[in-house]
């Protein structure tokens, strides 16, 4: 199981990262709660990936990590609904500041997989 560390990222453009060699996830402590959660879930998606080929398969690995993030955000969000029928993709995406069409499609697919 990966260890979690927080770092002072005020002077960095990096919100977080997974260090394969040490099996640790590092998160910028100056992110708000939503962004910390998004970064944590994204970086958890890199755990177990064969990162020695990262540069060759970067797009695939990042997409898988984003899907993992969305999956876990949905697991957090769905219990807050009174009825599963109340789920609204746009509201979910607004709540977690997700903006891309790719994110939207992943939300729809992951939601369908969960219900």
Language-model segments: what does each one mean?
Residues 1-115:
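Active-site hotspot residues in diverse enzymes, especially metal/ion-binding acidic/histidine motifs
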């Amino acid at each position: 199981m990966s260890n979690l560390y927080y770092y002072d990222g005020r002077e960095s453009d990096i919100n977080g990262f997974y260090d394969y060699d040490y099996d640790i996830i590092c998160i910028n402590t100056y992110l708000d709660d939503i962004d910390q959660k998004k970064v944590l879930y994204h970086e958890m998606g890199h755990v177990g990936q064969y990162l020695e080929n990262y540069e060759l398969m970067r797009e695939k690995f990042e997409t898988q990590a984003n899907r993992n993030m969305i999956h876990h955000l949905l697991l957090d969000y769905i219990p807050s609904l009174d009825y599963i029928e109340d789920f609204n993709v746009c509201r979910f995406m607004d709540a977690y500041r997700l903006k891309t069409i790719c994110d939207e499609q992943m939300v729809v697919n992951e939601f369908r997989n969960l219900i």
